[in-house]
Amino acid sequence: MMNGLRRTFWSSIHKKKDNNRVDDSLDRQKPTTTSRFGFFSNPSTPRSETRPDSVTCSPTIPCQSWSATAISTPSPSLPASPKLQCDTSGDVTPTRNRSPLSFLSVSSSSSTPSSPKSPASFSLLKSKLCFTKVRILNRNNQVNIFKNNSKLTFLRLCYEQSSISSSKCGICLQSAKAGRGTAIFTAECSHTFHFPCVASRAGDRNLLSDCPVCGASWRETSLLPLSLSSSLHESGSESDSKIRESKNNNKSLRVYNDDEPLISSPISRTGFNTIPESNEDEEEEDNDDGEFKGFYVNTPSPLTTKKMLTDSVTGHVDVKLSSEAAIVAVGRGNETYSVLMKIKSPSLPTARRSPVDLVTVIDVSGGNIEMVKRAMRQVISSLRETDRLSMVSFSSSSKRLTPLRRMTANGRRLARRIVDDISGDGDGMSVNDAVKKAAKVIEDRRQKNLFTTIFVLTDRNRNSAHQAQLAQPDFVTSTRFSHLEIPTHTIWLGACNHALPEDVFAKRIKSLLSLSVQDLTLNLGLVSGSGQGKVTSVYSLSGRPVWLGSGLIRLGDMYGDEEREVLVELKSPSSSRSQRIMTVRSRHVDPTTQEIKNYEDRALMIPRPTTVRSSDPSIARLRNLHVSTRAVAESRRLVEVNDYSGAERMLTSARALLVQYGLSSSDSCLRGLEAELADLNRLRGRHVAVKSPEPVVQKSEPLTPTSAWRAAERLAKVAIMRKHMNRVSDLHGFENARF
């Protein structure tokens, strides 16, 4: 039967009459996949009516150039036999290039037809066995390959061999099996490629927009380089990439950009500035007298308004020295003494207070949650319409309760309702996460007020080393958080032995919301005519003792009527008994106008230093305060450079000196040093635990088939070694069986 089919098939070959039939056949060709034996396929299978225009012959198999057409006779088993054509130029030279990717240049010149009896059947059968898929594409990945007077500009034949379905790369045709040390990329069409092969084609977007094997469009390119992924998505799937990027950002870190617009935003979405909402109480007061007051009413003039805006700018920072100075050390020809300095910021009128963006972090894990709610209601009442408030609660986890919302009448009502509904229970260990979330709210806001701050409300007690040194402990501690230098105030409601009066608490909250001076710096010195001497060190007493500097100290931002204390250490010759004068020059930035204000030097009389032998107990207290404050501040400077031994020696020597002075264990200075020693030991233990030698852990590598294979091999080796170590003889247990 096969011989009959072969005779019937080849008897229908005749010579080609016209060379233009090549062009017609190529125009009718479609990028379809042919089977290996097209003339034995199912009748329903689509067939290619032509064959490639040139054939690269193997040097071991002779192939003459020929031009013929084979038309099969219809039969029940073969209703539509294909029509075969093969044209080559007259001078066909054998080549040894067996690369699977070949580029064929087709000439428009006609070739001389050869005899139809040439032995091309075996070559045709060989080509059918070697090639599985043939696809002809031009530069635009279209089927039509003729342009500019029917001249072929670019022709690419992409084909697969019969064995590259899943085990070879579709680009380099090398082995693409897992475990060979090369990352494998599997496309949506299930074709596999080497990842370096795919990445190397990132320069041309057309090369990777479709699969090099089957031509399927690639849409999921998450494993490709970012530049490649962006170029591919620009061509067809920009919306999909934006959705995926937004999902990834939401998974990593949420963005809080849903803040309410400011009351007088310079740029409004609608194109005009909104009208400020008035207070209901003010409307009632204004509507009390509805009579016409005439044309000459007492309205504030522009000059009066300007004066009101500049009242706080002209206020100086008040600096005073205490009336005592205690000698703390006596050396050869000089003596060291210390004196207290009090700094108070000017008061700020409520009308001139800058709008504030406030984020409150509420601790709902304590037992006295009603105290926290009462304090939060007082904070809400202290805000104005131009202020914005956001609330974050935390217990075992943190949660943002409200976005930044203006405190209008409706805003206050909604905030109070949320505070009334607060209830929680937990261990309160997520305070750091809550503060980070509060800082993220401030960082992601779309519109910004001039002043921002964070309040942390908790009913816990302060348990710190520096707090024990203060005679009157404060229930507010201040610091700065994150790279934005956000002022963060922790209000320790549990530190108050009794409930604070509402007016005292409200006054303190308003002072924390009123930024009086910004970036305050003081330049301290001694008048040259008042004897030789210098300022050696300045230590902060507000909060944790910190070394501020020697002559130029930076105090940062200060709020309305805020008071701070610093301890100034001076050194002067012992023989000089003249009156010494200190000069103070202040410099700060006005928070409203952002103008830099420099003030002239002010002279302060330094009190005469007194030894501790005097009967005044304040001198001994000042000396003890200097010893403990200096030890804590200097130990912290040593801890910053990881000198834990030096810091411990500093604290222990100061403690021994205070014990030598006759202080009892209940003294605040001794308790502060002991608490600082406990903190230092905890920090040292943590530092040693980090630097302690740990078992060698191999570097983690990305999860790939190669890494998984290596991990499996390591586990197998460990299992074999354990089995070998636990192996016993076959006669184990039968030594005393007496065979």
UniProtKB/Swiss-Prot annotation:
**E.C. number(s) listed in UniProt:** 2.3.2.27
Q: Which residues form the VWFA domain?
A: 357-459
What's its catalytic activity? S-ubiquitinyl-[E2 ubiquitin-conjugating enzyme]-L-cysteine + [acceptor protein]-L-lysine = [E2 ubiquitin-conjugating enzyme]-L-cysteine + N(6)-ubiquitinyl-[acceptor protein]-L-lysine
- Per UniProt, the ranges with Polar residues bias are 31-56, 86-98, 265-276
Q: Which UniProt keywords apply?
A: Metal-binding, Transferase, Ubl conjugation pathway, Zinc, Zinc-finger
* GO cellular component entries: plasmodesma
Where composition is biased (Low complexity), the residues are 99-120
Question: Mind listing the GO biological process terms from this record?
Answer: polar nucleus fusion
Q: Which Pfam families match?
A: VWA_2, WAV3_C, zf-RING_11
Q: What molecular function does GO assign, one term?
A: transferase activity
Please give the Gene3D superfamilies that the UniProt record associates with this protein.
Answer: von Willebrand factor, type A domain (3.40.50.410), Zinc/RING finger domain, C3HC4 (zinc finger) (3.30.40.10)
> Composition bias, kind Acidic residues: at what positions?
278-289
- Upon deletion of the gene, what happens? Embryo sac development arrest. Unfused polar nuclei.
Query: Zinc finger (RING-type) locations?
Result: 169-214
Chain positions covered by the region annotation Disordered: 19-56, 72-120, 232-291
Q: Which residues fall in a compositionally biased region of kind Basic and acidic residues?
A: 19-30, 235-248
Q: Record's InterPro entries? A: CLCR (IPR051266), VWF_A (IPR002035), vWFA_dom_sf (IPR036465), Znf_RING (IPR001841), Znf_RING/FYVE/PHD (IPR013083)
* Annotated PANTHER family: CALCIUM-ACTIVATED CHLORIDE CHANNEL REGULATOR, E3 UBIQUITIN-PROTEIN LIGASE EDA40-RELATED
What's its job? Probable E3 ubiquitin-protein ligase involved in female gametophyte development. Required for fusion of polar nuclei in the embryo sac.
Q: What is this protein called?
A: Probable E3 ubiquitin-protein ligase EDA40
**Biological source species:** Arabidopsis thaliana (Mouse-ear cress)
Q: What are the leading ranks of the lineage?
A: Eukaryota, Viridiplantae, Streptophyta, Embryophyta, Tracheophyta
